[in-house]
């Protein structure tokens, strides 16, 4: 998209507040939304439609870790790329709901009011939104090690009988559109544990030109992940190659 000065300008994708606020009853009752229906509605708001390459690289079984760069910027919430990937999995593997179980952050930075630091309302809200959308909420910042351990044990327990991919943005919220970042601390161990449970990693590179573009690469087998000095860095290297 070109601006008047010939410089490429990023498109803006308005936050789908109607859909987000529609989760309120689930948050209040502790119930869950259809991730298939929710993500389909999010994708329908993306204009122009996103491009997806390399679907043929997805493995025969949906039992894997779906990994991608955290493609978020001003005017583009990470919800949009996550929804596109969720619907791509839905189309490839059929009527799974949830098509993907994403691992999401469980805490926001504290608010600053003058010299004081106040816990963010997101600390209360995010775990409840995560539950409503079948996500695993994991605080990766080290703020609550016991809670992190409980969340990761749940991921690993479910991985043994997973019928759908586990979704992960290894960079976390520090990831910025178009700029590869280091994976979060602990992601290496998580990927290695999941690999030992038999889950390969499926790298996807997200980029943007005239539209959002998703490039699905070759699957990284469990043996390659467990043999790597750092499984998370290996995954991010493959993702970086797909972003070009």
Where do the language-model regions lie?
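Non-catalytic C-terminal accessory region of glycerolipid acyltransferases
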Residues: 2-24, 132, 143-244
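Membrane-anchoring hydrophobic helices of lipid-metabolizing enzymes
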Residues: 1-100, 104-114, 120-138, 150-153
């Amino acid at each position: 998209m070109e601006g008047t000065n010939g410089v490429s300008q990023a498109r803006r994708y308005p936050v789908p507040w109607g859909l987000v606020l529609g989760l309120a009853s689930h948050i209040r009752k502790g119930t869950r939304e259809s991730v298939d229906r929710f993500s389909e509605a999010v994708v329908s708001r993306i204009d122009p439609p996103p491009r997806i390459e390399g679907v043929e690289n997805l493995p025969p079984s949906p039992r894997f870790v779906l990994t991608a760069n955290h493609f978020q910027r001003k005017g583009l919430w990470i919800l949009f790329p996550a929804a596109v990937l969720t619907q791509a999995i839905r189309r490839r593997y059929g009527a799974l709901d949830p098509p993907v179980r994403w691992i999401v952050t469980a805490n926001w930075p504290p608010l600053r009011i003058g010299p004081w630091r106040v816990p963010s309302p997101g600390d209360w809200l995010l775990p409840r939104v995560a539950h409503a959308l079948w996500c695993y909420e994991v605080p990766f910042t080290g703020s609550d090690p016991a809670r992190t351990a409980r969340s990761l044990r749940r991921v690993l327990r479910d991985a043994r009988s997973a019928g759908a991919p586990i979704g992960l943005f290894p960079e976390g919220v520090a990831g910025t559109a178009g700029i590869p970042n280091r994976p979060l601390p602990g992601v290496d161990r998580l990927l290695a544990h999941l690999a030992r449970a038999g889950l390969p990693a499926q790298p996807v590179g997200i980029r943007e030109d005239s539209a959002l573009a998703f490039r699905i690469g070759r699957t990284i087998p469990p043996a390659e992940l467990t043999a790597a000095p750092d499984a998370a860095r290996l995954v991010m290297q493959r993702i970086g190659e797909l972003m070009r």
